[in-house]
Amino acid sequence: MELLKRKLYAKILMMVMVIWIAPMTNGHDHASHVPGGRPGAHPSHGAHPAHGAHPSHGAHPSHGAHPSHGAHPSHGALPSHGGQVPHSGWGHGRATFYGDINGGETQQGACGYGDLHKQGYGLETAALSTALFNNGSRCGACYEIMCEHAPQWCLPGSIKITATNFCPPDFTKPNDNWCNPPQKHFDLSQPMFLKIAKYKAGVVPVKFRRVPCAKIGGVKFEIKGNPHFLMILPYNVGGAGAVRAMQIKGTRTQWIAMKKNWGQIWSTGVVLTGQCLSFRLTTSDGVMKEFIDVTPPDWKCNGQSFDGKVNF
């Protein structure tokens, strides 16, 4: 009888141990699959819809072969021309036009460019409002512009322009002048405006983004001023388009930092007559390029232009 009691007690003890140990074992096994454990096979990693093949990436209808974009501006490795300048994100503003159908009144301008046709900019230009012009630092920058939110006035497609002028504010008209800060406004040449909107619209809402400048040929350098106050205008600049720093070097000198005079005209008081001139440009995205012995030693300060042969 005593033996039977001991066997029964042993069975009960074993059952209690099984019941007590089993949950601990199962709990430990589960811990290898929670987010704090090995992430490999966890449903929140790997093929989770928020990663990898997320519907907003890859083959999303608004990306890839979109007629007006190429790759979406909010993603990393985007196509560029002449450098590694990415497309920026879309901003929103307005656009008007100035001048006539032939681009009259759009030549020259606050960036210091001259004959825009000869310099390669043509009619694909715009004057920027104060908020965009940024004291001339955006001269030469390129933008893609699309009309939006006005189906009765907007035309499909987009245009690409180079910033060549400044649209000044008029504080006597605080409510009617589109170029007053902080408004982001493009005053386009008339032919470019008519590519995205109807003439009678006058002013339309637009979305815009900074894009790489695709230019034909090398960067050009125009020499102005006088031997004691040399002024250089770099134009037809690809890549970021806008120049943020410039240096000059004569045959017998080291690199000399130039000061921005106005627009995209840079100056130095160092006399460099009788020397071949080389230039070093840094664009607004930080890319630097050298243009060696661009001029012969007998250059003149009379508006001569010289081809740097290469571009960004």
From Swiss-Prot:
**UniProt subcellular location:** Secreted, Cell wall; Membrane
Per its UniProt record, what Pfam families does this chain match?
DPBB_1, Expansin_C
Q: Indicate whether Repeat appears among the record's keywords.
A: yes
Q: Where are the sequence repeats?
A: 42-47, 48-53, 54-59, 60-65, 66-71, 72-77
Q: What does this protein do?
A: Causes loosening and extension of plant cell walls by disrupting non-covalent bonding between cellulose microfibrils and matrix glucans. No enzymatic activity has been found.
Question: Which UniProt keywords are given for this protein, alphabetically ordered?
Answer: Cell wall, Cell wall biogenesis/degradation, Membrane, Repeat, Secreted, Signal
Main location group: secreted
Biased-composition ranges, Low complexity, are 40-77
> Residue ranges of region 6 X 6 AA tandem repeats of H-P-S-H-G-A?
42-77
Q: Which SMART domains match?
A: DPBB_1
Q: Which residues form the Expansin-like CBD domain?
A: 228-307
What is the protein name for this chain?
A: Expansin-A24
Q: What is the gene name?
A: EXPA24
Species this protein is from = Arabidopsis thaliana (Mouse-ear cress)
